[in-house]
């Protein structure tokens, strides 16, 4: 409520109070203001306790949905989807976590290993490079393309 009030404003109010009220009466006024704030806080807390004591049972049915809405507002999108769709089964949504997918062994890892350890040249599984001049692609324009 008073988060925008800083030390310069407080100092200004004290100086104005000193000028308007006077140095003789200022300590008594500060003590009275402090006592009034304390009495107001005490009255508010007593009213809260009385309302909670007298009407606590009737308001319990309202507190549960309000607390549920407040907990949903504090959740992130992943937690809300998990709660709504999968009855809070966290493991199901963790299966779709991209960080875990990339960290686990996938086909991408096998592909990277194949690139690091190439197969021997004499292996029959590797494709042979064609030695025929016609089958190799040519760069640019050629009369062979037209005829």
UniProtKB/Swiss-Prot annotation:
Its main location: membrane. The keyword Cell cycle does not apply. The keyword Protein transport applies. It comes from the Bacteria. The Tat system comprises two distinct complexes: a TatABC complex, containing multiple copies of TatA, TatB and TatC subunits, and a separate TatA complex, containing only TatA subunits. Substrates initially bind to the TatABC complex, which probably triggers association of the separate TatA complex to form the active translocon. This is Sec-independent protein translocase protein TatB. It is a single-pass membrane protein. Belongs to the TatB family.
């Amino acid at each position: 409520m008073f988060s925008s009030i800083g030390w310069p404003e407080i100092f200004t109010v004290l100086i104005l109070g000193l000028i308007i009220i006077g140095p003789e009466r200022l300590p008594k006024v500060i003590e009275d203001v402090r006592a009034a704030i304390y009495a107001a806080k005490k009255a508010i807390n007593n009213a809260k306790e009385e309302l909670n004591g007298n009407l606590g049972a009737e308001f319990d049915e309202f507190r549960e949905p309000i607390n549920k809405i407040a907990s949903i507002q504090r959740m992130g999108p992943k937690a809300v989807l998990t709660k709504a769709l999968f009855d809070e089964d966290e493991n199901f949504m963790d299966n779709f976590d991209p960080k875990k997918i990339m960290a686990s062994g996938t086909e991408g890892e096998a592909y990277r290993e194949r690139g690091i350890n190439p197969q021997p040249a004499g292996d029959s599984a590797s494709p042979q490079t064609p030695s025929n001049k016609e089958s190799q692609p040519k760069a640019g324009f050629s009369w062979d393309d037209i005829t």
